[in-house]
Amino acid sequence: MSRDICVVVPTIREYECVRAYLDNARDHGFDTDRLFVVLVTEDFCDAEAMRAMLDEEGVAGAVFDESDREQWYDEQGIADYDHLVPAASHAQTSFGLLYMWAGDFEYGVFIDDDTLPHDEWDFFGTHLENLHHDGEVEEVSSDEHWVNVLYQSEADLYPRGYPYAAMDETVETDTTETDHVVASQGLWTNVPDLDAVRILMDGDLQGQAQTRTDFEDFDRDFVAGEGDYLTVCSMNLAFRREVIPAFYQFPMDDNAWDVGRFDDIWSGVL
């Protein structure tokens, strides 16, 4: 089978998480020859060690620190626009989108370097199954036209990016038919992805939420109803080539504090 999946991992920390995802693929019989791993890192990180890891794992891929990205922009004739993908920011994930667009990959997968797959779940295979889903699926909507992706949990959590004004919504579920899925949003166990205010409400001044999520919090797949929005977290996401532009992460640090933590949640909105 052709190498049709571009796996984008922005990393300045635990880049060896890639080994766990590759082990998961092999354990579940997923063909790793389909994968091309793009590690997006910085000049102060050990890019050579990352390249050595990809070689050891026998997987195709490339590592781009800031200098490598500048060279790539020059080669593509787009150096004048390099500021649209900020360095040393999670929004550098957008470089992986550009690389994927310039290639002939049919699918993209985002992975954060502080995550690991569950051994019992086929990470890549499940995402691809979702993208090829054809048939019935649960449809979720609300009277606020926002869907809380954690609505199945009994913990009453709202993920980072969910509007405060849309909380306490009335959730409605139905069954619909779908034959064209463009994005598969995975969820996460253990530490939930909350914003600062919700972490303080659920946790303490140490910046750590107290609630933990587990298997029982996510027991079935669903799609958002037509006309409803939902939040997107790019730590566990697969998508088709046709929607690459929707996942561009805008630079959000153009302010007096140089703070830009809301990069990925605005994908597809602005």
Predicted regions and their residues:
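N-proximal low-complexity "stem/linker" segments adjacent to membrane-targeting elements
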Residues: 1-40
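Conserved catalytic core of nucleotide-sugar-dependent glycosyltransferases
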Residues: 69-80, 118-251
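Acidic donor-binding loop at a coil-to-helix junction in glycosyltransferase catalytic cores
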Residues: 256-266
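Short aromatic/hydrophobic "clamp" motif used to bind/position activated sugar donors
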Residues: 108
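Short beta-alpha junction loops
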Residues: 40-45, 115
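Short, charged/polar "capping" segments at the starts of alpha-helices
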Residues: 15-18, 43-51
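Active-site-proximal specificity loops/subdomain of glycosyltransferases
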Residues: 46-104, 120-133
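Catalytic metal- and UDP-sugar-binding loop of GT-A-like glycosyltransferases, i.e.
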Residues: 111
